[in-house]
Each structure stands twice: as structure tokens, then as C-alpha cells.
Amino acid sequence: DRTSRGLGDVYKRQLKNSVKVTFNENGTDVEEEFDKLIVAVGRKPNSSNIIDESLNIAIEEGFIKVDEHCQTSVKNIWAIGDVVRGPMLAHKGSEEGIMVAERIADKHAEVNYDLVPSVIYSHPEIAWVGKNETELKDKKISYKVGKFPFAASGRALAVDQSVGFVKVLSDSKTDTILGVHVFGPAAAEIVQQALISMEFGASAEDIALTMFSHPTVSEAFHEAALAANNQAIHIGNKTR
């Protein structure tokens, strides 16, 4: 575990096509070489100079404070997207905009903030939706894990993109899917399938009983759902 380390100097080594990084570990400067350095410093809400202070709209740590329907502390003033709480994602902001427009028109609309998909457009891609294992453990929710590697996927092997896996987390009692995490080819598309399933309250068994085209990388989602109940076909299952 090398989290929370103070970063020092960073050098790009042209001849080796690598990056040399200095960081502090237990009070000592350590220098190591890596293939790549990903800079992920986060973002801040750009809420300054867009609100008339005389309106007295509540601001919390730079974010415009809103309720679950994006209503601010002032009646008839709404805020959406990156200036309000939650992940700074275009699709989340877009859905909030639709919800607000619907509610202004006196129609009922909601955003399910428990099912906001996230994607890292790296290579391989990383995508997830729902809960992760740490969150489930913190909430003391008993869950099952189904995991399927792309190394066992015929389509992934055929296109030479077999690195990664699909992980399905489902409730131990109800089998309801609680989270899906994908690292590998077409991760963003696979997670979208998972998101639709979760919106309708699908169980791992529901996905297991669904026919998937072969060969496709999305079969990995099918196999991971099967694996959640020790019924995987193309990999070994856990000993009961």
C-alpha cells in the first residue's frame, strides 16, 4: 500500500520511455521508475462569480447546496451539474437538467444517484456502477462475488484484448445485483448493460438466465453473474 505518499520530483526518461518519480516514504525519499505516471488531481466547482450574493443561495465548500431534486435554498432557483454535489460527470449533469426541466413543468422526475455509471477511458477501460466491496463491508451488507476474467473470453482472445475481468456483487440473501465493476475491453458498454439490469432490480440469476450472443465480450458479464452463484461455465467455480 503506497497511498498518501508525498510526491517529489518527476523526470521523464526519453531513452527508456519511462518516468522516474521521487516520493516520501516513512520520512525517507524513495526514487522509483515507472512506465507511466497518471496525474489525477481532482477538480473544484466553478461556482464563483455566477451567483448574485444578494440572493443568499447556500454554498457548501464551493458547491451550490441543493436537495435531491436540485432545488437550491432559494425557491424557484435550481442548480445542476458540476456546481452541485455528486460526481462531476456529463451524463449525471444532463440527467439532472432533464429532471429539473420536468419538475419546473410540474411533472414527476427523479435521478437515481445510486446508479450513476463511471468510466475511466484508459486502455484497457475501467468502468463501474453501484456499490464496491468496501462500501458493502462498511454498511455490513452480506454479499456474493462473481468474477470472470477476459482471459477466458473467446472474443477478447480473438481481438487480443484479454487483460482484465468483470466482477458482479450481489446480495447474499436476495441475489439482487448491488454493483458491477469492469476492467478490460468495452468496459463502458458492459457496465451500461449492468446499469439497465440494476435499474429494473435484476438479480445475478436474472442475468445468468439471459441468452448472450457468442462470441461477444459482454458474455463476460453473463459469466460473472453465473459465477456469483457458483454456476460459471467457462471457469472453475468456488468450492462450496
Q: Positions of the model-derived regions?
A:
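Conserved beta-strand-loop-beta-strand element in the redox core of flavoprotein oxidoreductases
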Residues: 15-31
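Flexible, acidic loop-helix segments that line cofactor/substrate-binding pockets
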Residues: 13, 109-125
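Flexible, glycine-rich terminal cap/loop adjacent to redox cofactors
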Residues: 122-132, 137-240
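Short, structured loop/turn "capping" segments at alpha-beta junctions
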Residues: 107-113, 142-145
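FAD-site-proximal beta/loop scaffold in flavoenzymes
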Residues: 31-104, 110, 189, 197
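Short beta-strand and adjoining strand-loop segment in the mid-core
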Residues: 24, 83-89, 119-126
